Amino acid sequence: MNHFPKLLSSQIGFDVAQTMLENFDRHYRIFREAAVDAKTLYERADWHGLQRLARERITSYDDRVQECVEVLQDEYDAENIDDEVWQQIKLHYIGLLTSHRQPECAETFFNSVCCKILHRSYFNNDFIFVRPAISTEYLENDEPAAKPTYRAYYPGTDGLAATLERIVTNFQLEPPFEDLTRDIGCVMQAITDEFGEFDAAPNFQIHVLSSLFFRNKSAYIVGRIINADRVLPFAVPIRHVRPGLLALDTVLLRRDLLQIIFSFSHSYFLVDMGVPSAYVDFLCTIMPGKPKAEIYTSVGLQKQGKNLFYRDLLHHLSHSSDRFIIAPGIKGLVMLVFTLPSFPYVFKIIKDHFPPPKETTREQIMEKYQLVKRHDRLGRMADTLEYSSVALPISRLDHALVRELEKEVPSLLEYEDGNLVIKHLYIERRMIPLNLYLQNGTDAEIEHGVKEYGNAVKELMKANIFPGDMLYKNFGVTRHGRVVFYDYDEIEYLTDCNVRRVPPPRNEEDELSGEPWYTVGPHDIFPETYGPFLLGDPRVRAVFMKHHADFFEASLWQASKDKLLQGELPDFYPYDVSLRFSVRYPDRFDSTPDAGDGDSAGDAQRAA
């Protein structure tokens, strides 16, 4: 039944809708300005500035929402607006969006504002956008001076090499390239190596998104090659190789490699998008099967991704019948974790009380999750979606799960109209817990898992992250085989830690003691003590010592800390370093190491 008013008679309704849209437009203008600033910082190789910009942008959305709420409260007494006017506000807002270029994001902003003003009983499609109202299909900025979402290039006219060079130079990056002709030759060789020689069909063309994607120390060109009925995705990372000189680092030509650089374990890109839905639609064509929610999140529109994810969850619940269950694996001391087997995510709730030896609070744990959200995750820490007042049908909850919820988190539960409302939770991609992966794995899988675990911790270390609890159960294996950290309640900055060696025992009594014979401060870490917790399985021990024997040496950890304190930002690559042109085609390069090779090739970091 449609409860909407037949006439839009409320001037307040129109004024409130217009005020909300003006506030959204301000938010999106700031969002785009950040992407423009990212290009300038990248050209200057100001990596600390880029990090700072990315952190500030994450909190910008919530700041704009709060500003809008305060304006509506002060000027319109929003909490006391009656229901009919609120319905008119939504209809006026829809009318204002008919020619808007970010309507889906504006609808999400409307929801965010309303959720801070209205009671959750109003969270239905009469008052907020449970479903989208404005279509984004074929949406494009048709103003004469506007950049198109993507540009089409036709190699049949000028040849592939000239076309590729024009694609790169059209981005008008300020530093010159060290040797663009060499790099274009590497791209063409990589295409031949991957696909062999292929005949150009009449429709042979290359589509390239008009804006660069900035993250860490790279700027990515993203596009697709179309030839006959084939659509071939590609991404080309551009990096500084010497002060004031750029180079194409590689070309990624496989869908799985693109899915990794756009994965949930990486920080968000900075990319200037006039019509974000058009960018997302394009990315969906080169990464089919990747949820739109994840793509919106990866390009920095995490609130839109969060909104789409929740719609996906509701849609899945209406088309499935299995029950939420307690997640398999070792139960945590701090979080209660459950999952829906048919849905590839886990739901995590902070418990009301924590048994010893945990000494923390709900507020401290929430701050740890915010730390991870703001930090560069490097492909080694899972992103989380944070929700309030999530209503799940009681009929879909396993009885054992309900009992566990009532036991561990009673303060966060409300029963309402056949639903269990959870006041606060986090949602993450479901992964195979590393302890189960190693426990059940073949010899090859164990070697892969252990090698990945060591790489993950070492990369986190160089990014100033100390995981705290390094047990295998706190890491997961993604569908791409990457090991990712996902338990954040003990996480610390490495620079806040005091790396120590275990002092020698003073006497035989110390040596035989089951307790430390030395004082341990709250931020002291002793890498050499991790062995008993990580090397109990002989198969694990053998491969661990083969690949990561230095893991237990305090000098490794201290060296990373020292570099961080000196302001160094290491190089990380979201692809295997063997794909880098300088490694793959060394004969095309001179022997002088580039600026991205501060570490030896063997130490070069991967963060997939």
Swiss-Prot record:
Q: Which residues form the active site?
A: 383
Indicate which residues the UniProt annotation says bind ATP. 327-333, 348
Q: Identify the keywords attached in UniProt to this record, alphabetized.
A: ATP-binding, Cytoplasm, Glyoxylate bypass, Hydrolase, Kinase, Nucleotide-binding, Protein phosphatase, Serine/threonine-protein kinase, Transferase, Tricarboxylic acid cycle
- UniProt keyword annotation of Aminoacyl-tRNA synthetase present: no
One of the entry's Gene Ontology molecular-function terms is:
protein serine/threonine kinase activity
Q: Predominant location of this chain?
A: cytoplasm
Q: Where does it localize?
A: Cytoplasm
Cellular compartments per GO CC: cytoplasm
Show the catalytic activity.
Answer: L-seryl-[isocitrate dehydrogenase] + ATP = O-phospho-L-seryl-[isocitrate dehydrogenase] + ADP + H(+)
One GO BP annotation of this record: glucose metabolic process
InterPro entries the record matches: AceK_kinase, AceK_regulatory, Isocitrate_DH_AceK
**Region Disordered: what ranges?**
589-608
Q: Which domain of life is it from?
A: Bacteria
Enzyme Commission designation: 2.7.11.5, 3.1.3.-
Protein task = Bifunctional enzyme which can phosphorylate or dephosphorylate isocitrate dehydrogenase (IDH) on a specific serine residue. This is a regulatory mechanism which enables bacteria to bypass the Krebs cycle via the glyoxylate shunt in response to the source of carbon. When bacteria are grown on glucose, IDH is fully active and unphosphorylated, but when grown on acetate or ethanol, the activity of IDH declines drastically concomitant with its phosphorylation.
By sequence similarity, the record places it as follows: Belongs to the AceK family.
PANTHER family associated with the record: ISOCITRATE DEHYDROGENASE KINASE_PHOSPHATASE, PTHR39559
Its name, as the record gives it, is Isocitrate dehydrogenase kinase/phosphatase
- Encoding gene per record: aceK
